[in-house]
Structures are given as structure tokens and as C-alpha cells.
């Protein structure tokens, strides 16, 4: 009678609905998750489709957990203490650093606001972003190239679409500072994985904080599990 659909990329077409004659209610998590449901077919078949509010806050929290862990060397220090050691390095403060926000929407805005509390300068870019839209948030609107060149950390908050696949590729990664971090709590395909792994392996960028992956769970031998400059959390 009721189906709860959790994964937004799992399509729910007419053919599936027609095989469920008792189905009366189809639930999806998050507003965007209804996009892959055949809404016209649901209406015709008398199936009610309902979605929950998107949980932006949890993604914002995970984003900042990763940013802070990277800058402060959290995993290395905790690991050292657990092994009987003590301080291994010096954490880096956020005050005066530049955070690049790729996508200043429902998640990018609170991420930017928290950065400003820490004393960071926030710059942002997305394909349709304008200075008029960034000014109320005290965020500098910049070009895509400037964002990758100037940022000490870059966090991704754009939706997965044909236009955003591979938005961060070899060229963009080559523009990043040697010690800069890339944080992705958005969608994995926004970043071209092969040059990304190469940049992390060669340490041409400082590291990454990741909560989304092309394959979930990650294979045991995947670089995102093994590279010392990557913090991966299980989405």
C-alpha cells in the first residue's frame, strides 16, 4: 500500500507502478527526490506522492566537520594519542583564510555564514551566480578560475545535473593552491575522479574531505580509503 523510496537516483517509472496495484502512497526523502518519479503516471493511477523537507542542516554540519578535521589535523592527532604518542603537528587556524563556495544555495549559504564566524573571507561561484545575489550574504562573487586559485578550501554545494558533471576536472584542480583542500558533500560526479585521485596522490593539493562516492560502500582498496590526506565518511 505504501512505498518509501530513499535513493533519488532510483527511478520509479510507470512500469513499476503498474506492477503494484495496491500502491496508494509513494514517499520520497527530500524535495529533489521526486524528480525521478513518473508523477504523471502516479496521478493517473491514483497514487499520492509526498516528499519530506530536505535536511540541509545535516549536510552543513558534515561539511564543517570535514573542514575542521582537515585544517586541524584531527585524525593524525587522535591516532597518535591512541597509539601512546602525543602531538604530531600544528593545526592551521581558519581566521584570515579564504573559503571558496561552489554553489551559494540552501546549503552553501549557511556554510558561508559559519565560515565568516571563524573569520574567513568567503568567495563564491556557480554558473548563474551574480554579485547582486552574493552581496546580502557578505560574500564575494568571483569567476570559477579565481575561486580555484584563491581558496584555501573549496566546498561543493551544487546539484547533480548533466551541466554539473565533471565541473571540477584536471584544469580546475591544477589551479588550486598546493595546500588547499577540496570538500565534497554534494554529489560525486561533480568531480572528475581520475585527475582528483592523481592530484591527491601527487599532493599537488593539500587533501580532501569526502562524504559522497561513485561506488558506495567504497571498495577496500579504493584510494579514498587509503590516501593519508583524505578524510572519507560513509555518506
Where are these regions (language model features)?
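Short, Asp-centered acidic motifs that coordinate Mg2+ and/or phosphate
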Residues: 1-2, 25, 153, 181, ...
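C-terminal helix-to-coil terminal segments
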Residues: 51-62, 214-234
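Glycine-rich NAD(P)-binding loop of Rossmann-like domains
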Residues: 77-110, 137-140, 144
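Hydrophobic Val/Ile/Leu positions in short beta-strands of Rossmann-like dinucleotide-binding domains
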Residues: 28, 99-101, 124
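A short helix->loop->beta-strand "cap" motif at the edges of active sites that frequently abuts
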Residues: 20-25, 45-48, 120, 178-180, ...
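Phosphate/diphosphate ligand-binding glycine-rich loop within oxidoreductases
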Residues: 2-78, 92
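Phosphate-coordination loops involved in phosphoryl transfer and adenosine-cofactor binding
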Residues: 23, 95-99, 170, 179
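Rossmann-like adenosine-cofactor binding region
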Residues: 11-13, 128-223
Amino acid at each position: 500500500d505504501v512505498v518509501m523510496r530513499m535513493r533519488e537516483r532510483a527511478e520509479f517509472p510507470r512500469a513499476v507502478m503498474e506492477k503494484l496495484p495496491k500502491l496508494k502512497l509513494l514517499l520520497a526523502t527530500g524535495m529533489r527526490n521526486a524528480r525521478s518519479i513518473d508523477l504523471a503516471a502516479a496521478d493517473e493511477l491514483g497514487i499520492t506522492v509526498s516528499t519530506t523537507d530536505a535536511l540541509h542542516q545535516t549536510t552543513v554540519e558534515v561539511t564543517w566537520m570535514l573542514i575542521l578535521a582537515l585544517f586541524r589535523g584531527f585524525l593524525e592527532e587522535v591516532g597518535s594519542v591512541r597509539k601512546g604518542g602525543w602531538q604530531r603537528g600544528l593545526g592551521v587556524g581558519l581566521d584570515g583564510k579564504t573559503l571558496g563556495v561552489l554553489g551559494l544555495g540552501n546549503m552553501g549559504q549557511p556554510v558561508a555564514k559559519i565560515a565568516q564566524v571563524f573569520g574567513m573571507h568567503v568567495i563564491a561561484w556557480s554558473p548563474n551566480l551574480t554579485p547582486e545575489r552574493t552581496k546580502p550574504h557578505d560574500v564575494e562573487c568571483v569567476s570559477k578560475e579565481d575561486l580555484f586559485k584563491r581558496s584555501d578550501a573549496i566546498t561543493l554545494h551544487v546539484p547533480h545535473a548533466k551541466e554539473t558533471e565533471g565541473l571540477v576536472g584536471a584544469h580546475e584542480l591544477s589551479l588550486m593552491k598546493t595546500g588547499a583542500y577540496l570538500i565534497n558533500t554534494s554529489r560525486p560526479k561533480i568531480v572528475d575522479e581520475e585527475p582528483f585521485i592523481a592530484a591527491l596522490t601527487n599532493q599537488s593539493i593539500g587533501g580532501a574531505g569526502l562524504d559522497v562516492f561513485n561506488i558506495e560502500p567504497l571498495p577496500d582498496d579504493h584510494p579514498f580509503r587509503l590516501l593519508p590526506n583524505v578524510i572519507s565518511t560513509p555518506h
